[in-house]
Amino acid sequence: MLRSLGVAAVLLGACGLQQASVPDGLDVSGTSATIAVEPGDTGNSGDTSFDQLSLVAIGSLDQPVDVAARANDDTLYFVSRSGTIHQFSNGKFAASPVLDISGLTTGAGERGLLGLAFSNDGATAFLNYTALNGDTTIAAVTINDQGVFVRESLRTILTIEQPFRNHNAGDLVVEPSGTLLVAMGDGGSADDPLRTSLDDSSLLGKVLRVNPIDGSVTTLAKGLRNPWRIDLYDDRLWLADVGQNKWEEVSVLDAVSQVAMVVDFGWSAFEANTRFNSDQKSPAHVAPIVAYEHGDDGCSVSGGAVATTGALRGRYVFADYCSGRIWSIATDIASPTMTRHFDGVESPVAVARAGDEVFILSLGGTIWKLNG
């Protein structure tokens, strides 16, 4: 039997990201709790290659939603949805945040400080947050030679109006060229009421390439509902797109650096491969690489990162917020099978890679490192 970690009664995605019961303040000491997969529980009969996988709780934070590593810096930076960024080094958090923008956002519903990425030289932090009026804001903060985040340097790169409170997505990554990739949800409510996702004139429901200097935007993909977390690996952008009524999806935007035409992922003409809004057309949409139905497996996919070391090297690791299940899939075949590794992890809101490590972040506060 898979080891169960206990699931909190909080929901993400199809039902919206809700406020969790979180610990007061910040645990700066770290912990040593470890959960191991028992032999034979890899999901593949006779395959013991994943038997030594474990989740190690390294500490807790108020509503952690993202983590990033910075060039020429051995520390990690964890994001609290309430609007702060925290440095983690030598097994513990620093006592004070390195950046606090809590006055510019509110960590409630599906809003807050949602994403962090660093420039390739480590001199700039890029943020994705919802402003107090709910609009998506892509911003930059300078990091000086001493590694200090210069709060006064914060500048807005791009603002995107949000018509509803949910489906803000919130992640961003930096390409080798230095441009940003930003995933946008369809604007929210339910059923894509404004029909934004397939609308070429809207920035909602899209993957955007953003110039961090002038804020200019190029649309790379459309037809997305709420791609909450994304991961760029080997020129492929992995998208965990939260579903509506029935299906959760993992999709891939291939050859990102060479995209010449807008790629269509189908929403809201389709939910996964099932017809959805009959008035929407998507005749050549790219099907998800994996889709799973609402039920025992859950109801809200939490992406997702490609592991670069260990037994899961080269596999995409993802979770479901409702069921607390953690899976991986092979990245080198067209129709991979989901292999389940953990069950009942408490409210896993994100699976993210920082440096060569993969972390599972619980909205309830716990930060797990994937070992093995």
Model-assigned labels for residue ranges:
Residues A68-A69, A117, V173, D231, ...:
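Conserved beta-strand position repeated across blades of beta-propeller domains
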Residues S54-G83, C299-V306:
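Beta-strand-rich domains and repeat architectures in extracellular enzymes and scaffolds
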Residues A94-G122:
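Blade-loop segments of beta-propeller domains
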Residues V56-D62, L99-A108, I157-F164, T218-G223, ...:
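Surface loop/turn motifs at the tips and blade-to-blade linkers of beta-strand repeat domains
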